[in-house]
């Protein structure tokens, strides 16, 4: 990119260099050429953002601010993506509907937090679209000889759009004939440019290394993609799609309700800041939330933490539980299918009986968990697939509070970079 500015807030117009181009700055301006010196044209575009997005806005850290940005981030991700009747209008996809109807497999490629967003999305895609969906770590994808062809849709998820492993996965997928859709937050970055289409999340700049609002926005964007596929392929009736869109539209208000009660979660983080290890348990869409909660604690608090599918507890992880061990449990709604709620309550009983300090994330009105919980964090009631958008937030707040209680820099954790641009 060519940048001529007194500060980041002045950068609204950008010229994106394509592969094989260089720019020469002069006193009179600039010149874009190829490596062989032939004149070339860079791609111009405008970046729409507010300088206040790069300020802390009264918070102690960017991570805190970005956690509190999430209601607006969800609202911005949804903006303009459906009409007054609730039908999806993802015109930016630029992929023929006939090709989307022919898709017989979806592969989501991503790394880190984005991969966990992809795991959440898999449940929605398979439920709404009835398309077999895999989630691959991008850095493993091309090394295991994946089965990819013209009927495969690859979805590449990256906040920065510059994650090298994900970019290489995109290139490999396209070489095999697959269509690639990017879900990205950074306009004009490499992955969207090399993909066949892109869904931008428009969550605004994320300064803190540990991703928060980008994660939530990636899930929302993936849900929009899933609904659009279901609409195009006829897997859902129009009123069903309208119902899900209405639930998504309610998320900003529900998220704000959670954030208004953040002080209690912060206090819990301060109280448990000296723990040696923390476990996170979840089932169904709660499982990737458990993984993300553990990752956040590792990233910013340097605290050993592990996320597990709650059903795996008896297959080994329960051996880690000892007296005073903090264990977070994400409890599905009592309305969930397959008796999942009762099974997770049973898991809470199991770890509590072995001396764990149980921190339970459950909906308002769920009294079944109270008897076995040392602490209950309440979230607003929602449809099952919407719950990750809510249950993730307390885990973000907790990780940030633990790190701050330990005197750590939550915005710039050691050994980590915001964008991993090497393999």
Where are the predicted features?
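Single conserved hydrophobic/aromatic residue that forms the stacking wall/gate
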Residues: 1-12
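A SIS-like phosphosugar-recognition module
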Residues: 14-58, 62-66, 72-423
